[in-house]
């Protein structure tokens, strides 16, 4: 679990996070992590980092509609930002938006399980998780 030092003088606050997965063939339960959504109520922070590794997805999914996947990731970004273009969910408070984004789904783009951690800087924790769970996984 990341425990970065930083902005708040070392006072860590709890956060919850979920990975964003692309599951090309739901019946096979194979997935590629493409992002992380992190929420910290005490820090009033909801953030997302996402990147689509098109080559890796093509290896699992011979005929992908990656533009549709990218559009779904764009909607997730809008919801996290609270941008009304993201739909009705984007207008909810941050805790409820995280709840919707982390709710189990049987779709091509879906969240992984929710995990918890402590960090004094949730933005730095999000970046560390993104590197560990998405970027490093892509380079395996």
Where do the protein language model's features map onto the residues?
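Polybasic/polar functional segments that serve as interface/processing modules
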Residues: 1-140
């Amino acid at each position: 679990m990341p425990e970065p030092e930083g902005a708040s003088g070392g006072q860590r606050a709890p956060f919850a996070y979920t990975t964003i997965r692309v599951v090309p063939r739901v019946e096979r339960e194979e997935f590629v992590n493409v992002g992380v959504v992190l929420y910290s109520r005490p820090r009033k922070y909801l953030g997302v980092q996402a990147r689509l590794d098109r080559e890796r997805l093509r290896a699992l999914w011979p005929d992908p509609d990656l533009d549709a996947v990218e559009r779904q990731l764009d909607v997730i970004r809008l919801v996290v930002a609270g941008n009304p273009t993201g739909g009705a969910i984007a207008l909810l408070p941050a805790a409820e938006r995280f709840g919707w984004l982390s709710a189990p789904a049987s779709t091509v783009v879906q969240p992984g399980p929710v995990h918890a951690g402590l960090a004094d800087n949730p933005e730095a924790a999000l970046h560390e998780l993104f590197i560990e769970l998405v970027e490093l996984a892509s380079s395996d």
